[in-house]
Amino acid sequence: MMWEACAEKTKAMGGKIEMGCSVTRCSYDEVSSSWTVEYKDREGGLHTIEAEHVISSAPMREMVGGLTPAVSERTKRAAESLKYRDFLTVMLILTDRHMFDDNWIYIHDPSVKVGRVQNFRSWSPEMVPDPDKVCYGLEYFCFEHDGLWGSNDDALIELARRELIQIGLAKEGDVVDGTVVRQKKAYPVYDDHYARHVATIRQELDDRYPNLHLVGRNGMHKYNNQDHAMMTAMLCVENVLANTKLYDLWQVNADAEYHEMGDEVSDEKNGFGLRLVPTRVAAAPELAPEG
């Protein structure tokens, strides 16, 4: 799998991966332009890391709130105003009746709560090793602590089983097992004021914390697809290695566009080798700062 291979390559190059940890504070030293990152491991132990750069895919709201020295009150209010939509998936293992081969299908039936159904075997047969079974992921869009989110796993599995039969993708007795995965802050909310809030946050972070780099959907509060979210991290690494802003990460969007800063030179000369996904475009207008 891709992420297992990524982890092995990281460790082979001397990197260390800490799982199940919670960052509690990011402290910036303006004199040395360096960071001290404090985190808690899964056993509750406290640790500290010194860093020249911090790359964050954590939700922008929480990242801004954990910075030391603290941001201005204006930026703090902007961060606290950002909203998120949460998400849960009910995975059902059932008899394979070859109902559909797509990776996913959207459900528009108002009589059910499910919004999308994933077919995990269509992503990779290795995800469903039993050839006689299929695993469907029924996706529900919700808010943390609402009725759906707060339902226990057994109730959610029963709801998903019943709705899968109702929409014609299963029959009684097909489902043999199920589990639930909840994902907080899966979607950044684009309300009337989010762009202003993000622009306000970006402006102060760029001015006061130049070696803090925001990437990914939550980190940038930007509704990127997974491949575009990963591209922001890849281009961010190029910026860090070059010690300059070669790429404007905020131009990576749903059309796989980005803007390379500076002279127009070939990828062969730069050696970046990232041309298969994004294409070069003119810089988009900056978001207006909060007035």
Language-model regions, residue ranges each:
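Helical element adjacent to the flavin cofactor pocket in flavoenzyme catalytic cores
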Residues: 1-53, 57
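Predominant activation on well-ordered alpha-helical scaffold segments within soluble catalytic domains
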Residues: 4, 234-237
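Proteins with a high burden of low-complexity, intrinsically disordered sequence enriched in S/T/G/P/A and R
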Residues: 12, 199-203, 288-289
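Glycine-centered flexibility sites
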Residues: 15, 20, 216-219, 233
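Generic detector of low-complexity/intrinsically disordered segments
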Residues: 18, 90, 166, 233, ...
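Active-site-proximal substrate-binding core of FAD-dependent oxidoreductases
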Residues: 28, 174-185, 240-291
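Acidic/histidine-rich catalytic neighborhood
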Residues: 35-37, 47, 57, 62-64, ...
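C-terminal segments that line or cap access tunnels to active or ligand-binding sites in enzymes
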Residues: 41, 47-53, 57-231, 238-251, ...
